[in-house]
Regions:
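Short acidic capping loops at alpha-helix termini that bridge into adjacent secondary structure
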Residues: 125-128
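Pyridoxal 5′-phosphate
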Residues: 131-132
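RNase III-family endoribonuclease catalytic core
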Residues: 2-114, 121-122
Length: 134
């Protein structure tokens, strides 16, 4: 068995007049993340980890922030495409262990919904996904 591990990291600035998307779900909060896409930092970090584990560069290479087709795109679409890319190379997902670093909003009430959303998009069981907030 060939086990590969990837690491993903993403940061976006919180700003007014944007929706806050994390883990594929919209979270009710007065600020949102600034970005070319919906700026879902959790999904972007997961994409980077998957692509890195498969030695396939990073999210910016496959889905550049200069491309019209990625403007305001739902990051769940990028995650699904990333899963398709790694599957085409013969890789399957073992598990995801992710930590979101944010003082606000409190994310623990949303973790179950994020896990369910990500599992559905990725075609895996929820018990293959761990999300922590600090």
């Amino acid at each position: 068995m060939n086990i590969r591990v990837g690491f993903g990291y993403d940061v976006h600035k919180l700003v007014a007049d944007r929706d806050l998307w994390l883990g594929g779900i919209k979270i009710d909060y007065e600020l949102g993340l600034l970005g070319h896409s919906d700026a879902d930092v959790l999904i972007h970090a997961i994409c980077d980890a998957l692509l890195g584990a498969a030695n396939m560069r990073d999210i910016g290479y496959h889905f550049p922030d200069t491309a019209a087709e990625t403007l305001n795109v739902d990051s769940k679409i990028l995650l699904k495409k990333t899963m398709d890319l790694i599957a085409a190379k013969g890789y399957t997902l073992g598990n995801i262990d992710a930590t979101v670093c944010a003082e606000r909003p409190k994310l623990n009430p949303h973790v179950s919904a994020m896990k369910a959303c990500l599992a559905e998009v990725m075609g895996v069981d929820e018990d293959q996904i761990s999300i922590k907030a600090t």
